[in-house]
Design a protein with these regions (language model features):
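Short acidic, Gly/Ser-rich segments with clustered Asp/Glu that frequently serve as metal-coordination loops
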Residues: 3-9
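Thiamine diphosphate
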Residues: 11-474, 481-482, ...
């Protein structure tokens, strides 16, 4: 629609089609000149505007402006006066002509010049009102489609069809009126006019019930429609939900095994762990060609530039120049057979490419494994509509939020520091989201996700946060893969004889939690069970599922959610700490079987070091330690004076700014 083209997403990337020479692409824009509330361009002419925009972007433009009933008048227009009158009228006037009928049009349109007034002197007001617009003339529309389909000059084509909003409702009954979209039903007399206008075979009596009219199966109309659908290889809407299951490598295979044994003393980030897994997948003989890495001009940020030479960057034209870094190992290689989609600085464009790949199993019967990696702050916050659409379209693939965590991406300020993408991900019912800390967690989640989506064919897609902070990754004797997928597992335990607490953490803040456990043990004699929570979102969803089952089956024994089973029977209060808003961890409070304290990063980001940011947002090891001591004191298991001593010991200023409001 012409009104919808005010959305940046509608026209913002049309030059791409011109650059890619997509001469099989045809847009049809219904130019009825109206939005919901009023004219699209009341003071100008929207079709002329669109013509300029599309021609400038390298498109063919076909304008279907006037119907056949105007042709006799055009034949009379020897001096171009009618053409002049049409060119000078603005869209707000054209809306009036249709809304107010033939007499109004005779006076205000044709009546401006004697020559045009004379052209219609033999036409009745009804004849003038019936002068049709091109988009409602099947002959003109067919001619436009024929030209569009048969034009093969390497350019995409747009058809601008001039129409009337509420066409068929009748003058005075909603046609071309500003309130056309709000007319919920038509009066009986208006229905009769509609019936007569379009030749619908219903009697006056039948019309009173406003029946749904469908032509007979052997009617010319339905025969034609069925024939055309056969020529187009099927009917719409249609959704292919089943496809040939893929065999996903196991955790023992090379792509994942390299990340299961820790970092062997090296300090790496979870981003690096993810990229290594991705590199392993693209080298897989079975799956490699189906993997689609997608980046919005951030490949070097995430250490993915090695894929430029290895896989090539897709471009329709190949590479007509020698890149400036050709002498380097990881040079910028563009190729017609490239596999990396380098979309430039457009998260909406990159997300759209991801959706196309993530729905290819259904739309094209070709299963692809898309991985879209980007700055996490520029994900759901920027392209939330598209992420919601991806859920609706049953997309399957991975969205990977890089440089995640409000205090982990240091030095880039509030516009870049993400403390809420996981909360936004939780709003999409079929989006499974995780915030891993260690490489083995990343490996387990990616492998499980691939299996769920492409072997088991579950209707879901994944959001995975990865960070840019380097640290050593542990090697676990037995990686609890099932618990990692469920959202929570016991990482380690520390000893203490003066009390015990349960410490939960996710992402990079889990490492602050681990450090806090050492402080509690060494400084206060407090022991701790340390839990890695890979997904508070998954914990909550499972708990809600079981809660519903219990509600609907009151006579059956209720199953306990994973978070409850993990913490049940464990000593001490529970303290959860994350690099996200407190709401993220707080969402499981109802199923935590103990006193529950949540630390998080509510508030705007700041540009500073990680150490100072974590102090500012009150999620560093010292705040975790004091929160644990305070929780014990509230239970009467610790002298409250020790909480004050801890604040002094760790240099925590009671008068520091509140991160939520400062």
């Amino acid at each position: 629609g012409d009104g919808e083209c005010d959305e940046p997403e509608s026209l913002g990337a049309i030059s791409l089609a011109g650059r890619e020479n997509l001469d099989n692409l045809i847009f049809v824009i219904n130019c009825n000149l109206q939005r919901l509330d009023g004219p699209v361009r009341g003071n100008s002419r929207v079709m002329d505007e669109f013509e300029g925009v599309f021609r400038g972007a390298g498109w063919n433009v076909i304008k279907v402006v006037w119907g056949r009933l105007w042709d006799p008048l055009f034949e009379k227009d020897k001096k171009g006066i009618l053409q002049k009158r049409m060119d000078e009228a603005v869209d707000g006037e054209y809306q009036n002509y249709k809304a107010n009928g033939g007499a109004y049009t005779r006076e205000h349109f044709f009546g401006k010049y004697p020559e045009t007034e004379a052209m219609v002197k033999d036409l009745s007001d009804e004849d003038i009102w019936k002068l049709n617009r091109g988009g409602h003339d099947p002959f003109k529309v067919y001619a436009a489609y024929h030209e569009a389909v048969n034009t093969t000059n390497g350019k995409p084509t747009v058809i601008l069809a001039h129409t009337v909003k509420g066409y068929g409702m009748g003058s005075g009954d909603g046609e071309a009126a500003n309130e056309a979209h709000q007319v919920k039903s038509m009066e009986y007399e208006a229905l009769k006019k509609f019936r007569d206008r379009f030749g619908i075979p219903l009697t006056d009596e039948q019309l009173k019930d406003v029946p749904y009219y469908k032509p007979e199966e052997d009617s010319p109309e339905l025969k034609y429609m069925h024939l055309q659908r056969e020529r187009l290889n099927g009917y719409l809407p249609s959704r292919r939900s089943d496809f040939e299951a893929l065999e996903i490598p196991s955790l023992e295979d090379k792509a994942f095994a390299s990340q299961m044994g820790g970092s062997k003393g090296r300090e790496i980030s979870t981003t690096m762990a993810f990229v290594r897994i991705l590199n392993g997948l693209v080298k897989d003989k079975q799956l490699g060609k189906q993997v689609v890495p997608i980046v919005p001009d951030e490949a070097r940020t995430f250490g993915m530039e090695g894929m430029f030479r290895q896989l090539g960057i897709y471009t329709a034209e190949g590479q007509k120049y020698e890149p400036v870094d050709k002498g380097q190992i990881m040079y910028y290689r563009e190729d017609q057979k490239g596999q990396v989609l380098e979309e430039g600085i457009t998260e909406a464009g990159a997300m759209s490419a991801w959706i196309a790949a993530a729905t290819s199993y259904s739309n094209n019967n070709v299963t692809l494994l898309p991985f879209y990696i980007y700055y996490s702050m520029f994900g759901f916050q920027r392209i939330g509509d598209l992420a919601w659409a991806a859920g609706d379209l049953q997309a399957r693939g991975f969205m990977v939020g890089g440089t995640a965590g409000r205090t982990t991406l240091n030095g880039e300020g509030l516009q870049h520091q993400d403390g809420h993408s996981l909360i936004q991900a939780s709003t999409i019912p079929n989006c499974r989201s995780y915030d891993p800390t260690y490489a083995h967690e990343v490996a387990v989640i990616v492998q499980d996700g691939l299996k769920r989506m492409f072997t088991d064919q579950e209707n879901c897609f994944y959001y995975l946060t990865v960070m840019n902070e380097n640290y050593e990754h542990p090697e676990l004797e037995n990686v609890p893969a099932d618990d990692i997928v469920k959202g929570m597992y016991l990482l380690k335990e520390t000893k203490g004889d003066k009390g015990r607490v349960q410490l939960l953490g996710s992402g990079t803040i889990l490492r602050e939690v681990e450090a806090a456990a050492e402080l509690l043990a060494n400084d206060w004699g407090i022991g701790a069970d340390i839990w890695s929570v890979t997904s508070f979102n998954e914990l909550r969803r499972e708990a809600l599922l079981l809660e519903r089952e219990a509600f609907l089956n009151p006579d059956a024994e209720a199953n306990k959610p994973h978070v409850t089973k993990c913490l049940e029977g464990r000593d001490g209060p529970v303290i959860a700490s994350t690099d996200y808003m407190k709401l993220y961890a707080d969402q499981v409070r109802a199923w935590v079987p103990s006193d529950y304290t949540v630390l998080g990063t509510d508030g705007f980001g700041r540009s500073d070091t990680r150490e100072k940011l974590r102090y500012f947002f009150e999620v560093d090891r010292y705040f975790v330690t004091v929160a644990a001591l305070r929780a014990l004191a509230d239970r009467g298991e610790l002298d409250r004076k020790q909480v004050g001593e801890a604040l002094k010991k760790y240099g925590i200023d009671a008068n520091k700014p509140n991160p939520l409001t400062s």
